[in-house]
């Protein structure tokens, strides 16, 4: 059961980090007045 719990926590953390990364990377792109990396 411990392996299952670790697997679930890993998947959840992976999805959360992926969502946060996508949100942060898309945020400056939606603002035309602010360009960071082009």
Curated annotation (Swiss-Prot):
GO terms for cellular component: chloroplast thylakoid membrane; photosystem II reaction center. It is found in: Plastid, Chloroplast thylakoid membrane. Keywords: Chloroplast, Membrane, Photosynthesis, Photosystem II, Plastid, Reaction center, Thylakoid, Transmembrane, Transmembrane helix. It is a single-pass membrane protein. It comes from the Eukaryota. One of its GO terms (biological process) is photosynthesis. The keyword Transcription regulation does not apply. The chain crosses the membrane at residues 4-24. InterPro entries: PSII_PsbI (IPR003686), PSII_PsbI_sf (IPR037271). The keyword Thylakoid applies. PANTHER family: PHOTOSYSTEM II REACTION CENTER PROTEIN I. One of the components of the core complex of photosystem II (PSII), required for its stability and/or assembly. PSII is a light-driven water:plastoquinone oxidoreductase that uses light energy to abstract electrons from H(2)O, generating O(2) and a proton gradient subsequently used for ATP formation. It consists of a core antenna complex that captures photons, and an electron transfer chain that converts photonic excitation into a charge separation. Belongs to the PsbI family. HAMAP family: PSII_PsbI. PSII is composed of 1 copy each of membrane proteins PsbA, PsbB, PsbC, PsbD, PsbE, PsbF, PsbH, PsbI, PsbJ, PsbK, PsbL, PsbM, PsbT, PsbX, PsbY, PsbZ, Psb30/Ycf12, at least 3 peripheral proteins of the oxygen-evolving complex and a large number of cofactors. It forms dimeric complexes. This is Photosystem II reaction center protein I.
